[in-house]
């Protein structure tokens, strides 16, 4: 059962990291390339028969010129290769980064973090597909990828840098975004004093043969301090929207119920006239600068209008009843029937699957041919005209014709628990699920996700847990005893919930948004001699069979049993509070939502 509020939402280029070997003089100064070559030739012993007679002075001069040209070409090639390596190295994840300086997080520092929660959050919002550009044309990504900064940590870090004597320019955030291709330069983002920025001029050309790609956002401070590289989710490259009747065989181009979409309107196919459906200050409007991600839910045809409604699984087809809900504010539009559009005609009998970048219209259910429409920046109702010769079609205007596209979001959250760190904070580990294994004296928690490294430790609230790194997608840890949180308890007497965090060995805290719940037990558990070290060692030696068999039997759905001693809950963190429910009336034609 879903419940929603109704009808209301000059910096230089980034520094690169490279590794190279330099030959130095005895006094410590580096040799230039010519000196290095001479040094190598002097050190290299020569064996074999004597060579030919030395050439004449004219031949020597010609040979020297050729040799000098070859040296220049080699130096240019080496410089180009080094530049490419530097750009590639700056985008590589953790194992290729410099050594992380250890700065172990203390319990006091974790307690302070849990009290204040000065997180630094980066959200990359983008479309799931991108249309390819051919020849000299540039089909800019629409809607444009957006970067949002949430959390009070950004402002706090800026103020701390100023207090430490850093100038305003050195404390400013700098960001570049690119498509991960060496053929296209990264574009600078303007984040100075703002929490939002859109990359409006990104495109992918037909010379790029990739079928999928990811956006890369490189962030650093004006003083050159590297924050890291943050990647978007995977984006599929398409040539153009399909005009053929879609089938579910191309499921990656279809739109599933419960996924997020963006809607935009482009009058007379002019790029400058593009407006996006968006929610701001509790009202729907058509924005030329920001776009909203709306969850599209499939409803039963007989579902009545209500703030609470039952949703269905499956793919969205034309003619289906849907509900559009803003993914940020929770504001919802009335029940809509999605209809296919062809030459300013809404097709009443089309029933094929809705596909990426299709043009569609939204009929407002149980009204007299009213459609969701825009007029300048307002969202209004438009009454369609019946087609006298074709009763299965209705004529609509440009403002009621919307382009639909699926969207995705990559979110990264971190906090420097022991103060600023020298190494980039990326790769940021992401935890997708938790599985509780075993019970008794030693219960194990298995974390599944991405970007795990051996430098990470699992924390339950302000208690560090024994952690074992398995691979970049799996971590294991020992669940701490309840006495670590409730000193006087020998067993769990009442539900106790603690947040799960990952902490890097230089003090960076990565919140997971997941919690662990200790569930009540009837009494003290019988003591078992099994030690945590033995369990960890046994699991390391038996790393495949053990995990598979146990996780299938004891997954997160039944982990709350008293025998297991704990339970799991996943909570989505929202950065903006949902607005209160308010009564909003629709006005016909010339006015918007009030």
UniProtKB/Swiss-Prot annotation:
Keywords: Activator, Cytoplasm, Developmental protein, DNA-binding, Notch signaling pathway, Nucleus, Repeat, Repressor, Transcription, Transcription regulation. It is found in: Nucleus; Cytoplasm. Residues 20-87, 542-594 are annotated as: Disordered. Disulfide bonds: none annotated. Residues 58-87, 542-562, 569-580 have a biased composition (Low complexity). Residues 582-594 have a biased composition (Polar residues). Disruption phenotype: Lethal during the first day of pupal development. At the larval stage, results in a 'neurogenic' phenotype in imaginal disks, in which too many cells adopt the sensory organ precursor cell fate. RNAi-mediated knockdown in type II neuroblasts, results in smaller cells. CDD domains: IPT_RBP-Jkappa. InterPro entries: Beta-trefoil_DNA-bd_dom, BTD_sf, CLS_fam, Ig-like_fold, Ig_E-set, p53-like_TF_DNA-bd_sf, RBP-J/Cbf11/Cbf12_DNA-bd, RBP-J/Cbf11_DNA-bd_sf. GO terms for molecular function: DNA binding; DNA-binding transcription activator activity, RNA polymerase II-specific; DNA-binding transcription factor activity, RNA polymerase II-specific; histone acetyltransferase binding; RNA polymerase II cis-regulatory region sequence-specific DNA binding; RNA polymerase II transcription regulatory region sequence-specific DNA binding; RNA polymerase II-specific DNA-binding transcription factor binding. Residues 429-519 form the IPT/TIG domain. GO terms for biological process: asymmetric cell division; cell fate determination; crystal cell differentiation; hemopoiesis; imaginal disc-derived leg morphogenesis; imaginal disc-derived wing vein morphogenesis; long-term memory; negative regulation of compound eye cone cell fate specification. GO terms for cellular component: CSL-Notch-Mastermind transcription factor complex; cytoplasm; nucleoplasm; nucleus; polytene chromosome; protein-containing complex; RNA polymerase II transcription repressor complex; transcription repressor complex. Residues 131-141, 239-244, 266-271 are annotated as: DNA-binding. It holds the Pfam family LAG1-DNAbind. Interacts with activated cleaved Notch. Interacts with Hairless, this interaction preventing its DNA-binding activity. Interacts with insv (via BEN domain). Belongs to the Su(H) family. Transcriptional regulator that plays a central role in Notch signaling, a signaling pathway involved in cell-cell communication that regulates a broad spectrum of cell-fate determinations. Binds directly the 5'-GTGRGAR-3' DNA consensus sequence, which is present in the regulatory region of several genes. Acts as a transcriptional repressor when it is not associated with Notch proteins. When associated with some Notch protein, it acts as a transcriptional activator that activates transcription of Notch target genes. Required for transcription of Sim. This is Suppressor of hairless protein. It comes from Drosophila melanogaster (Fruit fly).
């Amino acid at each position: 059962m879903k419940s929603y509020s109704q009808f209301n939402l000059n910096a230089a280029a980034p520094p690169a990291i490279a590794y190279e070997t330099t030959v130095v003089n005895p006094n410590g100064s580096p040799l230039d390339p010519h000196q290095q070559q001479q040094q190598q030739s002097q050190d290299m012993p020569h064996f074999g028969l004597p060579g030919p007679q030395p050439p004449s002075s004219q031949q020597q001069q010609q040979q020297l010129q050729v040799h000098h040209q070859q040296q220049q070409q080699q130096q240019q090639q080496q410089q180009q290769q080094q530049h490419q390596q530097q750009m590639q190295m700056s985008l590589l994840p953790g194992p290729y980064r410099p050594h992380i300086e250890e700065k172990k997080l203390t319990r006091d520092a974790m307690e302070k973090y849990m009290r204040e929660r000065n997180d630094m959050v980066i959200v990359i919002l983008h479309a799931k597909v991108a249309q390819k550009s051919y020849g000299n044309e540039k089909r800019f990504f629409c809607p444009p990828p957006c970067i949002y900064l949430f959390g009070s940590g950004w402002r706090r870090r800026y103020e701390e840098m100023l207090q430490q004597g850093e100038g305003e320019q050195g404390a400013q955030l700098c960001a570049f975004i690119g498509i991960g291709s060496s053929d296209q330069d990264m574009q600078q983002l303007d984040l100075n004093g703002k929490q939002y920025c859109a990359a409006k001029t990104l495109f992918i050309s037909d010379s790029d043969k990739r079928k999928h790609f990811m956006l890369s956002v490189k962030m650093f401070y004006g003083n050159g301090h590297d924050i890291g590289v943050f990647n978007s989710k995977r984006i599929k490259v398409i040539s153009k929207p399909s005009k053929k009747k879609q089938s579910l065989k191309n499921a990656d181009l279809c739109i599933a119920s419960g996924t997020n979409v963006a809607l935009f309107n482009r009058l007379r196919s002019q790029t400058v006239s593009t407006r996006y459906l968006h929610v701001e200050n509790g009202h729907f409007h058509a924005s030329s600068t920001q776009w909203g991600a709306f969850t599209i839910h499939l409803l039963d045809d007989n579902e009545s209008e209500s703030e609470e409604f039952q949703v269905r699984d499956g793919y969205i087809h034309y003619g289906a009843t849907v509900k559009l809900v803003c993914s940020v504010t929770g504001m919802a539009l009335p029940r809509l029937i999605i209809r296919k559009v062809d030459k300013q005609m809404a097709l009443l009998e089309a029933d094929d699957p809705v596909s990426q970048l299709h043009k569609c219209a939204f009929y407002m259910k149980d009204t007299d041919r009213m459609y969701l429409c825009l007029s300048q920046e307002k969202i209004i109702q438009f009454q369609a005209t019946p087609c006298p010769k074709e009763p299965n079609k209705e004529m609509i205007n440009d403002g009621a014709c919307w382009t639909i596209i699926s969207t995705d979001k990559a979110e990264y959250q971190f906090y420097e628990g022991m103060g600023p760190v020298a190494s980039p904070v990326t790769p940021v580990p992401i935890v997708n699920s938790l599985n509780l294994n075993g019970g008794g004296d030693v219960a194990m928690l298995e974390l599944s996700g991405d970007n795990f490294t051996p430098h990470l430790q699992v924390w339950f609230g302000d208690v560090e847990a024994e952690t074992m790194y398995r691979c970049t997608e799996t971590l294991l840890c020992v669940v701490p005893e309840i006495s670590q949180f409730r000193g006087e308890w020998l067993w769990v007497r009442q539900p106790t919930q603690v947040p799960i965090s990952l902490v890097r060995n230089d003090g960076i805290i990565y919140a997971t948004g997941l919690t662990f719940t200790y569930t009540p037990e009837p009494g003290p558990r019988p003591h078992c001699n099994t030690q945590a070290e033995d369990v960890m060692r046994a699991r390391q030696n038996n790393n495949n069979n053990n995990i598979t068999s146990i996780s299938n039997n004891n997954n997160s759905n039944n982990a709350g049993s008293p025998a297991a001693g704990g339970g799991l809950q996943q909570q989505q963190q929202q950065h903006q509070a949902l607005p209160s429910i308010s009564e909003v009336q629709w006005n016909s034609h010339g006015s918007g939502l009030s």
